[in-house]
């Protein structure tokens, strides 16, 4: 069975690297620059905010349709232009640390009726499941659409360990009390009959509701590759789902309100299933929702789904902090939210500008064209076609001058694209420019 080690991150991310060789070519007309922390951005942010009535006049086209020829390669712009807001705030943020208190506060909102608790994976039922799986062995794919279960390295040790744990298992819970330290690997029993398995570490936490300690989420794209569970062939589909995507989004938004989280928006919705990673049993079908930062109403985007591309300019390590994108995942079926996870939270410290002055969109278009021209002229790419699939005003992270611990969330124009030079035609990449000063934004940091 395909599965990740459970540190709150479910799913499989594939990174496709385009190898482009540098060639001696004429210098592009316009230099492509990143925010170098020289204070220029701060000066713009200190300017008087644009009055709200003027913000209404900021106009963008409904779509961008254009073909840009660059030698024998081309960039096809064929995308709607997303500008979901009419005012453009800038925020200052810092990373928020995970502690046991973080988990306790979230659990208090989700399960105020928590009564009992036990260490996850230690009940007789759970240990028997794991022992049966260890005796069965691992699944080995024969590459011909079949396969078999067989022994694996360390199998005998696992069987012996589980037999000893089973012999000493005590199926008793203790009165619930707030957790004192991380990591947390417990199952909480509630007065209303719910069972919530809690996993929490120093960079994430996850709650699984009424699905057991071994439940993992598998999205439709992962399942379709085959082998996600046992001998499932390529093209495997997730079965019927008794909830609509719209209902799933409503449930996710309600969960955000329950947890008291602001600034998160739904970035994607995908059919998914929850499976028992030990017994290889499908537990329920529903939808996986990815939620990302959308402070100020900016369009959310999931940088973890964007591949690494040589067309994307990365800031040197000396110029940046390796910020990790705050991200949440939820699984929703007809019973509601059954799984919720948070990774790498950030804290908004203040609003730097309530309505920053943006560059005209025509200027943004020229900057993005120049980005593509710059890369194609300095690389030996022949006959490539890049297709721009999405253009959106997002909130992106850029550093604060002379401060490694804080960053700004600024409006940035994100340009997602695919390329016919890679092995995965549906893999998306992205470039972005700061909508305030036109400098490059490294989207893999945002």
PLM feature spans:
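N-terminal secretory signal peptides that target proteins for export/translocation
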Residues: 1-6
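Activation/maturation switch segments at domain boundaries
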Residues: 29-41, 395-446
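Sec-dependent N-terminal signal peptides of Gram-positive bacterial secreted proteins and lipoproteins
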Residues: 7-28
